[in-house]
Amino acid sequence: MSQTEASKTPKIPDSEPDGAKGKGKQQLETYRVYVVTWNVGSRFPENISLRHLLGLQDVTVDEDVKETNAHMPDIYALGLQEVNAQPQQQVLGLFKEDPWTHKAKELLRKYDYVAVKTEQMQGLLLSMFVRRQHVEHLQDMEAEFTRTGFGGIWGNKGAVSVRFTLYGCGLAFVVAHLAAHDHQLDERIEDYKHILENHHYHVKRYREIYDHDYVFWFGDLNFRLQGSDSSTEVRELLRDESQHEALIQRDQLYQVREKSQKAFQVLQERLPAFPPTFKFREGTSEYDLKRRPAWTDRIMYAVQPLNRQPGMHLSIEQCSYKSHPLYTISDHKPVTSDFTIKLYPNVRAPGVVFSPLSVWKIGDENTVEYRKQAEFDEGPNDWIGIYPAEYASLADYVAYEYVNQAESPTSSDSNHEPDPFETPSHHRRGRHHHRNRQRLRRQQEANSQEQVRLDFADDVELRHGEQYLLIYFRSTGVRGVTSLAGVSGFFVAEKRHGSPHRTEYHVD
């Protein structure tokens, strides 16, 4: 079976965006979003390549990475269902990232992408990757999950999501796994309603899924074909291309979204022009006739007319919608979709500006200096992480300091380790270094900005001769909302010579 792609359809009507708050003239520019959904059937990504799945089969890496990926996605959303969630795998997940996220990260890092957020609920996994040039502009990242299995008690079914604000617009990515089997249509509709009723965020203006400027909803939604045809009869109809449109009209998702409008009516979808993606005999592209073939794996989208601003229009276009029959490790075929969206590249949230730092003396105390912009508000759990220059994930920090805990020695008793993915673990190399003195000094400036100095302890373990950078995170705490407020330039770690001393760096 060859890969098929839908013919291009017009984009949905324009709508107007949330009010922009950046400085200067607001202009819209085009960005690309690439969405993946795949029920992997508890299989591991062994002996397979993800290049085709991620649209990289024709892309090579050369010395000029920025030129290479000029037309590549700005955002990847990898949504998987039935990731191996056996108890031993869940325990292992406390100490290392899941194999699927790791494999995607190791491939995408070659093209200058960073894993910025991962959320998992049992076998349901969502991993977000963003091109490095956009990472420092990510605001208000938050993850949420809703269980729908066994009346909302068990997480084998349900949804996980990641939302963030980028260049003045709110984006929500929701991956779902709904109730299975042909006769469970009403249960799937109830799952959808339950997710909407229980999925809430803590970001002003973006409290619910459909509050967002852009919504991407995808996953193994398990909608089947209406009718009493046998599996063999459906397979025979699929062999007749003239019957494709008649079959898709019988698709339950199409009917509840377009006809009865009982579920997903807010979302848009280009109707699949590819064959049904379920159920296959593993290791083949032949249908397993124990189940009737169905388009269970889907990707939908929406753009919302929030906070109207005259003359400015957001838009979205679904540029491709494909299945990938060459992947045969599970009984589902993966589905991908490539979108273009409009964002405001000139919108910048207030943050911090790091002073130049050229050398980090290994074995010494080092002082980091930064300036808080006038409108920037510190969060109660803000922290600064030290990262390798070529970090591939926001979880790759090697050391960190909490800002507010450093200000008062009596408040430095917490052993909580920050995690941008908001799933605390204790295996990270980063450590919170305590001192019985005030390690943070503030100086108010005349322009309502504040100059801040923060000491890092002398036992920060960096590698001699390698480059690093600093990232300031504004955070409300574990499973809270996280924003990137500033990224420093590169600096080199060098071994100290002579007796220990504190090294301070100042603005030139």
Model-derived features with residue positions:
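N-terminal, active-site-proximal structural segment of metallo-dependent hydrolase catalytic domains
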Residues: 1-118, 124-125, 184, 192, ...
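Amphipathic alpha-helical protein-protein interaction segments
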Residues: 24-26, 39-43, 71-73, 87-97, ...
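Residues that flank catalytic or metal-binding motifs in active/ligand-binding sites
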Residues: 31, 74, 123-125, 156-160, ...
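Short, flexible loop/turn elements at secondary-structure junctions
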Residues: 37-44, 82-84, 119, 131-133, ...
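A Trp-anchored, charged/polar loop motif used as the substrate-binding/catalytic surface
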Residues: 47-66, 149-164, 193-207, 218
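Catalytic lobes of large eukaryotic enzymes
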Residues: 60, 106-111, 174-179, 183-499
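Structured beta-strand-rich core segments of catalytic domains in phosphoester-bond hydrolases
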Residues: 68, 85-172, 176-179
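Compositionally biased low-complexity segments at domain edges in trafficked proteins
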Residues: 501-508
